[in-house]
Amino acid sequence: MRILGIDPGLRVTGFGVIDVSGHQLAYVASGVIKTPTADLPTRLGTIYDGVSTLIREHTPDQAAIEKVFVNVNPQSTLLLGQARGAAICGLVSGGLPVAEYTALQLKQAVVGYGRATKEQMQEMVARLLSLSGRPGTDAADALGMAICHAHGGNTLNTLGGIAPALAKKGLRVRRGRLVG
């Protein structure tokens, strides 16, 4: 199964594509969709078009996207929600089922700790997908979203989803940190 993960943002929307076979995760692609400095409709159109292009290029079976959190600034929350909506429209018009997860669910599922830092997310994603380096923060969150969805959005450590992948690398998670 191929999963497209999306980390929505108005300026930068992260994406990550993985293949899943049982507990095996394989990296396919990741990156960002950058919007131009332009009016809001143009930026939303860029996100929609970018997601549509990703679907054509990578032919995913399913998609996962981060839920919007309420920010201190209501205007920022509204803009993020609109960017997320443009991405969801692209996913749905591409025929994909879309799952939604909170940032807390994402971090809990991938790192094993709901308050994990960006750096911990990047490190865990790199290790789980056997990447030579850490992906950028937006791409790491999007890849993490795909990983989270691959394992049903649950806490992978307690379900054994992440444990086999880490054990093969001589690692485990303890108090939100990789040890090995």
From Swiss-Prot:
Q: Name one Pfam family in it.
A: RuvC
Query: Which residues does the entry assign to the active site, renumbered to this chain?
Result: D7, E66, D138
What are the BP-aspect GO terms?
Answer: DNA recombination; DNA repair
UniProt protein name = Crossover junction endodeoxyribonuclease RuvC
Residues annotated for Mg(2+) 1 binding in this entry: D7, D138
Q: How does it assemble?
A: Homodimer which binds Holliday junction (HJ) DNA. The HJ becomes 2-fold symmetrical on binding to RuvC with unstacked arms; it has a different conformation from HJ DNA in complex with RuvA. In the full resolvosome a probable DNA-RuvA(4)-RuvB(12)-RuvC(2) complex forms which resolves the HJ.
> What is a single cellular component term in the Gene Ontology annotation?
cytoplasm
The source's superkingdom equals Bacteria
What cofactors does this protein use?
Answer: Mg(2+)
Q: Does the keyword DNA damage apply?
A: yes
* Entry EC number(s): 3.1.21.10
Gene (name only)? ruvC
Which InterPro entries does the record cross-reference, listed alphabetically?
RNaseH-like_sf, RNaseH_sf, X-over_junc_endoDNase_Mg_BS, X-over_junc_endoDNase_RuvC
Identify the residues that bind Mg(2+) 2. E66
Concerning its family, UniProt says: Belongs to the RuvC family.
Q: Which reaction does it catalyse?
A: Endonucleolytic cleavage at a junction such as a reciprocal single-stranded crossover between two homologous DNA duplexes (Holliday junction)
